[in-house]
Regions:
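Short, glycine/acidic-enriched loop or turn micro-motifs at the edges of active sites
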Residues: 12, 39, 108, 140, ...
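Active-site neighborhood of divalent metal-dependent phosphoester bond hydrolases
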Residues: 14-93, 99
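Short catalytic/ligand-binding loop motif for oxyanion handling, primarily in non-cytosolic enzymes
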Residues: 40-43, 94, 110-112, 142-143, ...
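Conserved beta-sheet core of the metallophosphoesterase superfamily
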Residues: 116-188
């Protein structure tokens, strides 16, 4: 059976993120990483809420998710979703064929905050000798410098960025999927 790895930021900016979370939660071959948007949700609605986090979350597109969780979901359903988010890892190490990958939302690091918030630079040296890091969080146009073409998966030195701006407002945005078996790219 094939597996789908989702490297975070499923919620926010557009309606329907909560429904997507439910599908991921209930699908055995879907694996999700914690992204900064899920962390902002946890910081606002989770059991260890952080003062000021609601404003940061809403300023970063969280209003749809906030309203869905507070006013559409039942308290039981909301608690299940918050629990699901609280159990998400912030990175995966996977092996596909003879390739090893380190999947992380934002940037490979020993620091958990960096793994969901920090942005790599296109000229960063490889993070690993034995595996390829696959990240999101930073739209690929900032890695490639190409602001005129539809966003495309960016391949660097031991680093692949797959964030093609799906959550952004630009018409150049796309949802990208990278098949790890052969690194073939798919776009919606």
């Amino acid at each position: 059976m094939n597996s789908l790895y989702i490297i975070g930021d499923v919620i926010d900016r557009h309606p329907g993120g909560v429904e997507i979370l439910k599908i991921i939660k209930d699908t055995p071959n879907m694996f999700m990483l914690l992204g900064n948007h899920e962390q902002m949700c946890l910081d606002t609605l989770g059991p260890n809420s952080v003062y000021g986090s609601r404003r940061l979350w809403l300023e970063n597109g969280g209003s749809n998710t906030y309203r869905e969780l507070l006013y559409v979901c039942s308290p039981t359903e909301r608690n299940r979703i918050i629990h699901f988010l609280s159990m998400l890892p912030d990175h995966f190490d996977v092996e596909v064929g003879d390739r090893k990958f380190h999947l992380v939302h934002a940037m490979p690091s020993d620091d958990p905050d960096d793994r969901i918030w920090r942005r790599p630079k296109p000229d960063d040296p490889p993070y690993f000798e034995d595996r390829i890091a696959v990240v999101g969080h930073t739209p690929t146009c900032y890695m490639s410098g190409d602001m005129e073409s539809p966003f495309a998966v960016w391949h660097g030195n031991g680093l692949i960025d797959i964030d093609c701006g799906c959550g952004n407002k630009t018409e150049l945005r796309r949802l990208a999927c990278l098949r790890l078996d052969d690194l073939k790219e798919f776009y919606i």
